């Protein structure tokens, strides 16, 4: 698209790859997508990396991953969901000098750079702390977060919060209505996999 907003703002990427994948029955990050040899984590990194720099992968302790050209940070707290991993990713992004981070789940093969651009545009225009896509529900793991929210995440986790909604509810949050839900779709079973997968654009 003309005038990539992500070029005008310091935007890091945080890909959450350490989920337990109970319904899939196997690690989603290393799932090979139909029509090739690319794993889910490599596919999502290929999209996020077009708009975000640096990009961090949050993974579970001992979780096997293919060789990646980005930093991999291992979960310090196991079994607590995506909130503490998001906080650690935001802190790493802040330390790298980024003001915003696009945080997403690893199981989003339909993710597009256009979605990232739309969210970044809103973040710039509103200076909101959180910008979420909304298609009838809020998508917390395909959203823009200010990196200075890392301390707020720590406080929420220390208070016993586990849900990403707790961070959005305690922040200046903007929601963007999405007419196309395809880029937001998660893969929970093999039947959810698209075939073939097209690179996001």
From Swiss-Prot:
Record's comment describing the protein's domains: The N-terminal domain determines nucleotide recognition and specific binding, while the C-terminal domain determines the specific binding to the target protein.
UniProt catalytic activity = Mo-molybdopterin + GTP + H(+) = Mo-molybdopterin guanine dinucleotide + diphosphate
For this record, the Gene Ontology CC terms, alphabetical, are: cytoplasm
Q: Which cofactor does it need?
A: Mg(2+)
Q: What organism is listed for this UniProt entry?
A: Mycobacterium marinum (strain ATCC BAA-535 / M)
The organism's place on the tree of life at top rank = Bacteria
Q: Which Gene3D superfamilies does its entry note?
A: Spore Coat Polysaccharide Biosynthesis Protein SpsA, Chain A (3.90.550.10)
The family database entries (PANTHER family) matched by this protein are listed as: MOLYBDENUM COFACTOR GUANYLYLTRANSFERASE
Q: Which GO terms describe its biological process?
A: Mo-molybdopterin cofactor biosynthetic process
Identification of the protein by name? Probable molybdenum cofactor guanylyltransferase
* Gene (UniProt): mobA
Q: Which InterPro entries match?
A: MobA-like_NTP_Trfase, Molybde_CF_guanTrfase, Nucleotide-diphossugar_trans
